[in-house]
Amino acid sequence: MFEDEFSALQADMVDICNEYSKGFADKIFIYAANEGIILAQHFYCIDFNLYKCSKLNNAGLKVNFDVSKECQGQVLDILNEDIQKIQSVCDKYNQPVPKLMKLVYEPKTKKFNADYKYENQTSDEISVFDNYDAWFEEEKAKLEGGNAEPTGTTKT
């Protein structure tokens, strides 16, 4: 069934990112774009601060995260494969393929939120990288403005 296969792939994306953060993240953010090129990125909220995947060791926790290029590459490979599989599942069931998925998961509460866009989000002036950076900055502003959680800082 479409929903089951689609959900299982999203769960796999969340699982690999949760594993990457060793379960310490309060929120996991996954950006998955599929507009001719596939781009996957992930960042984390820990103790009301945002951290891009390469900066998790700046969180000041007593755990050492493997932020090596090799480990980051392995995570991105899995995320990219899952994005391709999502496209295949959508095609198999004649469903529209999301051009952009913004997934947010809170491991402690198991709260999951997904925002899907089915129209291209890029243009000659705006790249998928620009859109990822804009989402990161949007979440940063929410933290700093106290809209979602107590004020924090962002580690880029």
Residue ranges and their predicted role:
Residues M1-D4, F65-E70:
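Short N-terminal edge-element motif at the start of the domain
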Residues M1-L56:
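N-terminal "first-domain core" detector
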Residues S7-N18, L76, N80, Q84, ...:
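Generic detector of well-ordered alpha-helical segments enriched in charged/polar residues
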Residues I16-Y20, V89, E138, K142:
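Surface-exposed polar/charged interaction patches
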Residues Y20-F24, I28, Y93, V97, ...:
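Short secondary-structure junctions and interdomain/linker hinges
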Residues G36-V67, Y105, N113-S127:
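Extended intrinsically disordered, low-complexity coil regions enriched in Ser, Thr, Gly, Ala
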Residues Q72-S123:
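Amphipathic protein-protein interaction modules
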Residues P107-T156:
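Acidic, proline/glycine-rich low-complexity IDRs
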